[in-house]
């Protein structure tokens, strides 16, 4: 059994035995405390840090999607309802085990340095300028999340891309009740 803090998706459908979506793993806070109840499933299970993202993942599976489809849809949903935990402006990687072929695949979509970045760009007079390296616009990377999710979908997904992102578009357009933590984050 997989035990990790944060969001994870475990699917036992025929195409995929296990998906570890490390970009979603985050520390659990008081708003996502575990109830202590045991839950079992014979076909598939979706668990995330936010119930709306969990609903999105379950709906994708119920509509014939596989674990990758659900992971992609969940990632976009989390970037709407819990943007500080799973932003599309970030990056990550995905490890996939394909049960039919018994092969493992890794998709690395971590942020990359901008094209004009140089090795010494944060060094001033021979010393690392921490403020420049950590708190300036120069310290940002080129996001990889959307590209990585797209590659995973192209290689392993079943459902149309639009069907995977539509729930997140609806959440963003129609709105949702935010948690106290998100409210605090947005107000800072």
Label the predicted regions.
Residues 2-17:
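Bacterial N-terminal signal peptides that target proteins for export
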Residues 12, 26-28, 56-57:
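Intrinsic-disorder/low-complexity regions
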Residues 15-27:
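Bacterial N-terminal signal peptides
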Residues 31-55, 59, 67-188:
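Noncatalytic scaffold domains of N-terminal-nucleophile
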């Amino acid at each position: 059994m997989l035990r990790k803090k944060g969001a994870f998706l475990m699917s036992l459908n025929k195409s995929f035995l296990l998906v570890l979506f490390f970009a979603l793993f985050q520390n659990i806070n008081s708003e996502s405390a575990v109830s202590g109840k045991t839950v079992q499933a014979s076909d598939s299970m979706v668990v995330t840090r936010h119930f709306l993202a969990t609903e999105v993942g379950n709906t994708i599976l119920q509509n014939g999607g596989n674990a990758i489809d659900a992971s992609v849809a969940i990632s976009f949903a989390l970037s709407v309802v819990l943007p500080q935990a799973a932003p599309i402006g970030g990056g990550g990687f995905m490890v996939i085990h394909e049960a039919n072929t018994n092969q493992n695949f890794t998709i690395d979509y971590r942020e990359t340095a901008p094209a004009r970045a140089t090795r010494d760009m944060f060094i001033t007079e021979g010393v690392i300028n921490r403020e420049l390296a950590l708190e300036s616009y120069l310290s940002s990377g080129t996001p990889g999340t959307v590209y990585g999710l797209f590659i995973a979908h192209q290689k392993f997904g079943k459902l149309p891309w639009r069907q995977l992102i539509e729930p997140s578009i609806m959440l963003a357009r129609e709105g949702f009740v935010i948690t106290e933590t998100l409210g605090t984050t947005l107000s800072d």
